[in-house]
């Protein structure tokens, strides 16, 4: 530091001296006690409010496609903090007198105090006792870009631990932290992520937010993260191993990593990937009498990303079995049927008091062969069966994206895509797992592909609900049974299909010729009397959403985009 302060203090303006010192650090970037760094060895990459020195040797990699992930993560942590603070405020109002009595008896020298049910920690030693703060762990930090963005862009952040197991990565984090002047917030750390989290759990120094973004599966880090997160804390989880989670092979590896089998060769495989990850989180949390609440679950490009709130709730742990399911899906026509593992019922006991009875479910819901096409059923799961999103949380994320990030496209370059994808997610049916593609069904029964609004209008006229899905373009989620789906799709064809011209061995022929067997006369008469393809509320909602000028799905942004190879550390 001697070289920066050779001007005598008597003749120097303190402000000017500090400004010159900071400028010199930025320009020459010499770490104290270390040799000068040649800035020509680095590419300076700007993302959000952070600038990182990206080594040209690529010992630590930067993937620009992941900016959407990081923009979304910043926005979601802000939304969680806002909602989290509101919950704490309500709790403080309800227990104001009790907290006042506790404050009078507490030791004023205490450094920190927890408020409410998992509220952000508050600095008791500060002049403002009600000023909240957040501690964040980025367990697998690589360059430190995400941690630096959290420090720059999220209010109330007191500390971000930027951890990595590779010494080269930690050196990169140190350079970037100092280059961005966030040394007081971002703390580079060289450690095994699990060891770090278990250590913090043992010392009761837990994190409010834990971000797990590994190369591949998140499974090895889940147990430690669940135990080291604060009550009501936010976990951000990424899995990039979609060849296992959503591919047509490796069911044994999927089961070993996630405790369930994926929907092999099925269109809904990306949603089943989300449900397998959420089931892993729920099963792990249940061992510690905790539960995870999905706030936002997205299938994005080449990975899945879920945002969950972790809290202690022995009562909700009892519901885990009934919110877990297996799925029977036909290998030929694609129809599927879900089987919950447990059931919940209300019973009347002594003194006319009701109690909750937990029991195993009855099944299976299907025969050995598909009733529509005589195809073979494959089994997927166990996996999570409940809602993927929290509507209130998504609305807060969209509000921040629209209002607080307005006119900040240079900082949040993926604002439009966040708006588009989350608008779809917010309007998804919450109680209808999986989706179907009218294009696929039309190809099965040899029909011209009908307009999406026509299919939705038909299902809506029969009294069923429909929604788009964020996971796949031109696909629908619905609470309609599969006999209604096949019926409506057949009726979408203006001309009656001549079965004599179809190959009897095809799936489409088997479905259409067997209709009297799987669609009873009573149900068919009801469908015939109700069916209409005139616009209705369901089709109107779909068309309104489709007409919005928003970016719904990712277009190929660069040549050879996608997951990068592992960094070369040799």
Swiss-Prot record:
Per the UniProt entry, the effect of residue 467 to L is: In strain: D4; loss of activity
- State where Zn(2+) binds: 330, 333, 370, 373
Q: What else is known?
A: Present with 15500 molecules/cell in log phase SD medium.
UniProt: S-adenosyl-L-methionine binding residues: 70, 146, 164, 195
Would the keyword Transferase turn up in this protein's UniProt record? yes
- Family of this protein: Belongs to the class I-like SAM-binding methyltransferase superfamily. Trm1 family.
Q: Which Gene3D superfamilies match?
A: N2,N2-dimethylguanosine tRNA methyltransferase, C-terminal domain, Vaccinia Virus protein VP39
Record GO terms (molecular function): tRNA (guanine(26)-N2)-dimethyltransferase activity; tRNA (guanine(26)-N2/guanine(27)-N2)-dimethyltransferase activity; tRNA binding
Q: Where is this region: Required and sufficient for inner nuclear membrane localization?
A: 133-155
Positions of the region Disordered?
A: 91-128
Organism equals Saccharomyces cerevisiae (strain ATCC 204508 / S288c) (Baker's yeast)
Q: What does this protein do?
A: Dimethylates a single guanine residue at position 26 of most tRNAs using S-adenosyl-L-methionine as donor of the methyl groups. Required for the modification of both mitochondrial and cytoplasmic tRNAs.
Q: From start to end residue, where is composition biased (Basic and acidic residues)?
A: 102-111
| InterPro entries membership | SAM-dependent_MTases_sf, Trm1, tRNA_met_Trm1_C
Catalytic activity line of the entry: guanosine(26) in tRNA + 2 S-adenosyl-L-methionine = N(2)-dimethylguanosine(26) in tRNA + 2 S-adenosyl-L-homocysteine + 2 H(+)
- Ranges for domain Trm1 methyltransferase come to 43-489
Return the EC number. 2.1.1.216
Q: What is this protein called?
A: tRNA (guanine(26)-N(2))-dimethyltransferase, mitochondrial
Give the Basic residues compositional bias ranges: 92-101
Superkingdom of this protein's organism: Eukaryota
Q: Where is this motif: Nuclear localization signal?
A: 95-101
